[in-house]
Each structure stands twice: as structure tokens, then as C-alpha cells.
Amino acid sequence: MWSLIPLTAIVLVLVAILHRLFFHPLSHVPGPFLARFSSLYLHSICYLGIEATVLRQLHIKYKTKVLRVAPNSVSISDSEAVGEIYVRGGGFPKDDRYKNFNLGPIVSIFSSLDREYRDVRAKAVAPLFSPAQLRAESGPQGVIGGCIAEFVDQLRKSKEAGIGADLMDMCARLSIDVVTGYLLGQKYGGLQENAHLPPQERQSHKLSANPFIFSIVAFSRFSLLPHRIFQFLYSTSQRLSTNDEVTESFLKLDRFTNNVLEGTTAGEKVSEKPNGGYYHERLISQAGISRMEAAAQSQAVLFAGADSTAVMLATILFHLVQNGAARSRLLCEVRSDKPQDMRFLRAVVKEGLRLGMANPTRMTRVVPKSGPGLRVGDVLLSPGTIVGCAAYNLHHDPEVFPDPFTFRPERWLDDGTDRGLRRPGMEKSMIPFGVGSRACIGKNLAQQQLHDTVVAVIDSEVLEGARTCQERIEIIEWFNADIKGHHLDIKWS
């Protein structure tokens, strides 16, 4: 009898494989052989940080807009499907993968699967992201404008001292100060953290928040795993691999957010309190959440806003260092008689967002079980299927973006100076912040910081004479993009 158990197990496995290959509702969808019956393929490329590149190549190999990447999961590289998946009727629901982005017992605004839970919190803080509110803090006396001025000044000092600068580290310092200063009312102090050190010494001292942020980004390599397995791996990893640097980084961030909630003056008060209060105050007073949750939600927005915006800003500045013609054109526009008509500035930022991708991989959703399914071209995907579009695929579609891996901001111009690069469908293929009701709540703040910083940097001419220390930016394609080596160095000649 015992000898039958292994045989029975083998038969059951073979039956499951045959079902997934030939009888599953997705059996008609092309994809790699292993991916058609096992999730191991998808987990492997996710872990290695090559998911976006591999899936793009497979879409090309199989000549399909719909690619089977796991037994019940597909990748979609058709911008026509974006509206149906993410926008109409609030979009498809998020899948269980997002539970892995919870903050321990706290469900964040981003990770919430419950729309009502998310909406109550998002609506409470939405006024902070209004364009008018952001513009008010973008002048010389505002927190956003003040942080940007300090950022440019530090770049200038590095240039005058004849030393290089790490754009990634500097942009991280700027972003964390903008996010905390504007949303929480106290700056983290990233830009001033090493101000007491000589310029040369500052190069080896990176932002204190980075070790913890990098560890969180890296753990998204496991984000596709079932939640219980993810929890086990996360807790095991915390016990085995956490080092003193990561622990100290976390403790400093934790102390900062606790100080913010306690209303202490440990951080620098940077602006008049906005109507209705700061981010954490609005969550407590208007969403009715606990102080513990408000602290966790504040840490979440700090991480999400500071890290992703830093990556995108560093990407834009990196390409501007390499593109003297773009800098010259921008300078003329910034100093023109009509600076409000910043067409080329908008084009530069858009092109940076296209290449910078804070989230390069699929933003997964579930086809509603109560609906008729999802049709993409001639392919019908049944209810319950996990679907998703990846920014990496859409942003590098050569039919929409000729020369897709090159920084060509002129492609966004509609005044006849696009050099033949402009194509229909570019706007709907751009998803740098996600789309629909679950798009990034902080995208207006990120956009304000990006536009204002580029203007200030170009107007200062601080990038003149600079060169990048590497030819191109390489990213690790986890859920959050991670720039390889965590640095983008420039030097002045």
C-alpha cells in the first residue's frame, strides 16, 4: 500500500500538468513551456530582477500581445487594454500579491485590496496633492522651492570643489526632504545630513535612510509568492541577513516618524500647516485611523514617494548631462519671455518618466469573477485570470516609441520639431504612475518636484562641463526599479 503513495503523487502531478497544458482556460495563450504549467518560471525571473526584459523579449518571440507567464497569469502589452484593466468602473481588483506590501499588520493605502478602505484614507489626504497647494510651496519661501534651492547649491559646491557628485544619492536626499517637509511638516534632513563634512568626505557618506529603503526594494523580488510563503521568507531573511547598517537606518526612520506624530521639534518645521493639517493629521482626524496606523502610513508614503521620485529625477538629470543640445534648448525656454509655455520642459520630463519607470513590471489585477472576462484583441481571458500591463513593455514599444531605449524628448513635441518620432498612442502607452483610481496618489507632488528641479538645475547651468561616469543606466527589474550599484556618478572637467 505504501508503495502506491509515490505513484499516486506522480499521477496527480502529471494530471495537473496535462490539465494546465491542454484543458486550462489559458491553454490557448502562447508562452514558455515551463510557464504554462508552473509558476517557477515567473518566480525565477522576478527574483533575478529580469522580469520586464524577459517578458518583453517573449512578447516579441511569440508575436503576441497576450503572453502566458504562469498557469493562471498573463502579461499584456497592448495599451488598448489599459483602460479596461485599470480605469473603467474603478478598474479590476488587485490580486493577493499586494498583501505582500502590507506594513506588518497595517494595510497601506497602496497595498489595500478593499476599495472602501483605500478610498477613505486617500480622500482624506487628497487635498494635499492639489496643484494649487503644491504651487504655493514651490516658490523661494515654500518647502519644495527651498529644498530644490539647497539641492542646486550643493551641486554647485561640488562643481566648484572640483569633485564629482552622485546624482542618485543627491536626488534621494532632495526627494526625502520634499516628501517629509511638505507632507509631514518636518524635513527628514537628508540634504543637511552631512553638511558639516568637507565636500570630499561627503561623497562616501550616503543618505542614512537608504540601507532600509534598499532592503525593502530588494524584498519585492519575492512579491509574487503566496502571502504565507512570503511572510515566512521575510521573517527568516530578517533574522539571517539584517545587518547593523539596515537596523540603524530603520531605527532612524522610525524615530523620525514617531517624532512627527508626537508633534516634537526634533525635525525642522518648514511651512505653515495646510488647511486640514498634514498627511498624518488628516488621516487621524478625517479618516479616523489610529496613531499607530498613521505612523505606518507616513512611513509608507515616505518610502514610496522619496525612492521612486529620486530614481526618476536622477534618470532625467543623467540624460541631460549626456545631452548638451537638450540643455541648451531648455535654457532658452527657461529664460524666455514666456516661461509659462514650457513645452520642451514637459517633453524632457515625460521622456525621463518613460525611461525612468519607478515600477517597470506588471501592475497585476484579477479579471472580475462576476464578469464576462477580458477580451484583448482575439484573445478572451476568463474570469479569475491574473492580468497586468508592464511599463517596461509599453514604454519600449518601437511601434509607438521609435528608438525606444534612447532619450529623445523631441518625440513629445507637436509643433513639427519632433524629427519624425511622434506617433499616435504615445499618451495612452505611458503609465509611469499607474492609471485610474488606484494610480499613485503622490504623482502631482512628484511631477511638481521633477519640473521645478529641472528648471532650477538648468537655469543654474551647474551641469555645464559635467560628464557621466557610465554610458547607460542599468536597473534591476523588481516591482520597484532599483538602479544597479545605487549610484549615478558625474564629474566635471
UniProtKB/Swiss-Prot annotation:
Where it sits in the cell: the answer is:
Membrane
The protein's matches in InterPro entries, at most eight in alphabetical order, are given as: Cyt_P450, Cyt_P450_CS, Cyt_P450_E_grp-IV, Cyt_P450_sf, Cytochrome_P450_monoxygenase
Annotated residues that bind heme are located at C440
PANTHER family on file: CYTOCHROME P450 (PTHR24305), P450, PUTATIVE (EUROFUNG)-RELATED (PTHR24305:SF156)
The membrane topology of this protein is: Multi-pass membrane protein
Xref: Gene3D superfamilies: Cytochrome P450 (1.10.630.10)
EC number of the protein: 1.-.-.-
Transmembrane residue ranges: 3-23, 301-321
Q: What does this protein do?
A: Cytochrome P450 monooxygenase; part of the gene cluster that mediates the biosynthesis of the phthalide-terpenoid hybrid 11'-O-desmethylfendlerol. The biosynthesis of 11'-O-desmethylfendlerol begins with the NR-PKS mfmB that forms 3,5-dimethylorsellinic acid (DMOA), which is then transformed into the phthalide 5,7-dihydroxy-4-(hydroxymethyl)-6-methylphthalide by the cytochrome P450 monooxygenase mfmA and the hydrolase mfmC.
According to UniProt, the name of this protein is Cytochrome P450 monooxygenase mfmF
Q: Which cofactor does it need?
A: heme
Print the keywords alphabetically.
Heme, Iron, Membrane, Metal-binding, Monooxygenase, Oxidoreductase, Transmembrane, Transmembrane helix
Q: Which gene does this sequence derive from?
A: mfmF
What's this protein's family per the entry?
A: Belongs to the cytochrome P450 family.
